[in-house]
Amino acid sequence: MALATAAVHIYLGVITHVMVVTQPDATAAAGGAAALGFFAALFYLDGLGYIVLIVALYHPAFARFRRLTRWALIALTAATIVAYFALIQGQYDAIGIGDKIAEVVLIVLLIMEGRRDRRPAEAPITE
């Protein structure tokens, strides 16, 4: 889920950047190059944030930070959802809504995984 949403945000960054470079009329109508360049940067940073946190969450070298990393990934995901609805201004699209659904599922899965990791390991059965 996290890799999928990272890919979506990097894709949106590329599409937005290409629009700024190749479609000056559409860029002007959408708020100008500065505004769209800012959004492209946000998309890139969001995608990169997901990738970095996924690596940190599952790489054995960072195992001692797993709980903190999981909460950071949950916070990034929640912030992404809030930012989408705050900035989209009612102009919803299938990619955005589909990605928000994936992000909600990601949060649920991360919480479930965190609860599972907190449970003590079952003692082996000896006879």
Where are these regions (language model features)?
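Membrane-interface extramembranous regions
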Residues: 1-127
